[in-house]
Amino acid sequence: MEVSQDGSERDKTPPPSSSSSSSSPIPVVTNFWKEFDLEKEKSLLDEQGLRIAENQENSQKNRRKLAESTRDFKKASPENKLSMFNSLLKGYQEEVDNITKRAKFGENAFLNIYQKLYEAPDPFPALASIAEQDRKLSEVESENRKMKVELEEFRTEATHLKNQQATIRRLEERNRQLEQQMEEKIKEVVEIKQRNLAEENQKTMELLKDREQALQDQLRQAKDSVSTMQKLHELAQNQLFELRAQSDEETAGKQSEVSLLMDEVERAQTRLLTLEREKGHLRSQLQTANEDTDNKKSDNIDSNSMLENSLTAKEKIISELNMEIHNVETALANERESHVAEIKKLNSLLNKKDTIIEEMKKELQERPSAKLVDDLRKKVKILQAVGYNSIEAEDWDAATTGEEMSKMESLLLDKNRKMEHEVTQLKVQLSEKASLLEKAEAKGEELTAKVNEQQRLIQKLEDDILKGYGSKERKGALFDEWEFSEAGVAEQSEPMDQKHVPSEQDQSSMLKVICSQRDRFRARLRETEEEIRRLKEKIGFLTDELEKTKADNVKLYGKIRYVQDYNHDKVVSRGSKKYVEDLESGFSSDVESKYKKIYEDDINPFAAFSKKEREQRIKDLGIRDRITLSSGRFLLGNKYARTFAFFYTIGLHVLVFTCLYRMSAYSYLSHGAEETLMTEATTNLPHGL
């Protein structure tokens, strides 16, 4: 997001002025990136990245070990926990130290690159100022051409109208005014662009400060997130065991509470039934009392009122008990729902933990075995021997022994001979290309010198012509003024025409000479530009060829290094030391040091490791798959095998088709004979009857 904002702000800011190219941005940008040495910083960043990846892998391994040790510590008995606590605490302390070292290394790497890039100037203003300067220059050149055209028109008018001195003065005044206006416009544009450049620099400084603050905040947040993740991991482990214990306790408590609530509900129901029975009994007594005597109404009013009061009181008690039962049932339902929700949560947590445990088990199962690790170690040692020459002779003997070693020796010797032949051919080609490049560079320098000389002569000739033309104009103007002041307008027309006829003829002849010379110079300039273009294309082609040959030489140097290391370990003991010395003498010290540096910079251990991994996958295949793969490679890689397989398949198809044809013919003949016999039998049968 920050990069896009920077780009949008760049697009919104106006381009710098033409004078800014002569000020600080362009030389500052060029000096900074020249001193920055980007290739060196890339190599340092690659090393730091590899180290960071290695530290991450080591930390993951240590964390797994600590997790296993903590798991063992929790499973251990209390007597063994005291003895295991010190080692576990020491492991955690070592892991904390390693994490702090990782953090310090990452912070130092970030601060180093940040300190170097903090003072980096933005190349956009310089490039924009150059583009704006080119645009302004093209505009000024177009205006200059227009002014030259106008000046030429004015001069032609002046040659035809020499008597109109007022017109000439007016045009000259207009020219001066236009020049002054142009200078003022240029000054205004320069001032505006300088102000815009200052504002843009201020904005870029503010943006850089904001970006620095944002990066610091991000770093702080990353540190806080790392610490919180560690704490959350520890809390999650503690909460898992606590939740299991709490779930067991809560299930037991909930069951006891449910049983108590059920007992209370049963007691309330029994009490409700007794009260309802009493209510019915009292109602029956009241009805019997009303039916027995009407005379005793006055006497029984008090008893009825008492009975009604007791009945209402009992009804209130019954309603209260019903409300209590309803409340107890709702509370019981809520408790059941909460208990079910908690059980679901606990089950989900347990399922998550079980899935995590299953993933950890799968990851442990996918880990390589001890045998595979030993094989990989051997391969890494062989890779070190091939790439870095950092293995001892004993390890090399253990890695490659017996018949495989003899086969490898023969193959390496054959490759060594081929590479020597290729190296000699490439040296010859390189010398030829270098000589051609030197010739082309010399020719290009000669042509550039010739072009510069011709440009200098053209400039000198134009200056001389302008000087001569200006002096003639000044002399003619003075003479015209003097003649005009001495004589009348009518009298001076004839001598003026007579005097200016030869001057106009001289000017026309001089213009013809200048035009012809200009055409010749233009033709020569076109020829030189075309030749320079061809030479540039040739130089580009030669540089590409030189880069290709350099890359081929680096590859050959790597192969020769491999052969030298192998011969140094094995072949020297068998009496081929002289051969190795002859091989080493093929390179001079300077060339060897140069290609050694390029080769060491371009070493990529991951390519060799991927090759070893591919070979390991091929070894892990079944016998049938390996036989199929090797036979396919053999058939596709050998010319004679391909031709043999082609003709073999054709012959096999021809044989199969001939066999099928003969079998079909035999079957047809046999069926035909049986049919003839059957027909003869049928014809002879009635005669026999």
Swiss-Prot record:
Disulfide bonds: none annotated. Residues 1-27, 49-76, 278-307 are annotated as: Disordered. It is found in: Golgi apparatus membrane. One of its GO terms (cellular component) is Golgi membrane. Residues 79-367, 410-467, 514-556 form a coiled coil. The chain crosses the membrane at residues 644-661. The keyword Transport applies. Residues 662-689 are lumenal. Residues 65-76 have a biased composition (Basic and acidic residues). Residues 1-643 are cytoplasmic. The modification N-acetylmethionine is found at residue 1. Belongs to the CASP family. One of its GO terms (biological process) is intra-Golgi vesicle-mediated transport. It is a single-pass type IV membrane protein. This is Protein CASP. InterPro entries: CASP_C. May be involved in intra-Golgi transport. It holds the Pfam family CASP_C. Keywords: Acetylation, Coiled coil, Golgi apparatus, Membrane, Transmembrane, Transmembrane helix, Transport.
